[in-house]
From Swiss-Prot:
Organism lineage: Bacteria, Bacillati, Actinomycetota, Actinomycetes, Mycobacteriales
Name the UniProt record assigns to this protein: UDP-N-acetylmuramate--L-alanine ligase
Pathways involved: Cell wall biogenesis; peptidoglycan biosynthesis
Organism field: Corynebacterium glutamicum (strain R)
Segment forming the signal sequence: none
Residues bound to ATP: G126, T127, H128, G129, K130, T131, S132
InterPro entries: Mur-like_cat_sf, Mur_ligase_C, Mur_ligase_C_dom_sf, Mur_ligase_cen, Mur_ligase_N, MurCDEF_pg_biosynth, UDP-N-AcMur_Ala_ligase_MurC
Amino acid sequence: MTTPHLDSAQDIDLSRVHLIGIGGAGMSGVARILLARGKTVTGSDAKDSRTLLPLRAVGATIAVGHAAENLELSGELPTVVVTSFAAIPQDNPELVRAREEGIPVIRRSDLLGELLEGSTQVLIAGTHGKTSTTSMSVVAMQAAGMDPSFAIGGQLNKAGTNAHHGTGEVFIAEADESDASLLRYKPNVAVVTNVEPDHLDFFKTPEAYFQVFDDFAGRITPNGKLVVCLNDPHAAELGERSVRKGIKTVGYGTADAVQAHPEVPAMATIVDSQVVAEGTRATINIDGQEVSVILQIPGDHMVLNGAAALLAGYLVGGDVDKLVEGLSDFSGVRRRFEFHGAIEGGKFNGAAIYDDYAHHPTEVTAVLSAARTRVKAAGKGRVIVAFQPHLYSRTMEFQKEFAEALSLADAAVVLEIYGAREQPVDGVSSEIITDAMTIPVVYEPNFSAVPERIAEIAGPNDIVLTMGAGSVTMLAPEILDQLQNN
């Protein structure tokens, strides 16, 4: 668990900020907030993307490609350079020049920590569900008239943005554990949705991964609260340990989970949930007040995320009824069970195409279970998935679990591994997953052939999901077009 040389974020001058990888989900969000606060923002990214256009429109100067001269995009050198060390190599020419010029280089998490200062900080952490829970919290608090600032890892469908500099006191953000970045923050409210070993390429052992959440809980302000999901064993255990340490801790979850963990005071209990035509109707008791909310996004995991969002909003002064109104209006986040379209007429009539970021077995299980619930409620159709594994290390670590999770679908097409920052590993391909699956599955290493493979498998009223953290998202519109015109 090592990090490259980075400078301390203390006393950093944020008047001119250069962001390497500005098009990324996290970087683009902090760029928006800097611009809204009147800072000079420059940046670079390896390729042009739809993320860069709105940043340029509000004042950012951005170069495509990395070069030493990019540090002078504003006409003078920046006062600080921001990078994500997991994604940006240390020989990046902009990093090299920054160090030659003596310009401080900090992580994106350090910058976010600076932006959070002076706010009532609501930080959402956990192995899964951070983006959805953060987004739900934002929409709920906006409806309650709180106008929070926020920085999330996905684009809110309704707002069309991933960040906002609000007029209210609250700042809501994701707390990323993948490189221990969450230890940069001092939350007033810290939500932990779940804890399950991941990012072992960085942490090396599950124990080290678990420890970072304990350390995060220890950074909560004296009058703050830790909020844990009691349906998740490791999050519940974190809550119990925190209670014993004297950290103010509350829990949320279904009634049976609340009963199973009496040591953690429950402040949000899911009394009941059921699938209805509009989505999922849930009855939730928030600190003695029973409310009913309809969630448009399916799945038991989304009900838990919704309960967490309501509780977070309540703990920072939001009116429960108004928070519920906002949550009922939540239409999702880009790449989280995102609807791309449905087929009208022809042999695939009624088939619907969705895209999801799920890239861990637990996330895959949750999304496919939600899709299966929707198919069951409709009384027709099947669940078809096109899955692209993400990272060789994760594929090796969880090959058995991926096979089991994907087998919740009725049929699957599995693409080759998206390596991202990792180099290929001898003997490791997606076939170590497909060989263990128990449903009809096609291993398709040819990316461009996937829409055709799906057309050979899909039928009317099916839910077709593209799934993964890599380039598979590009296939959703292509599959829609293939089925519509087949």
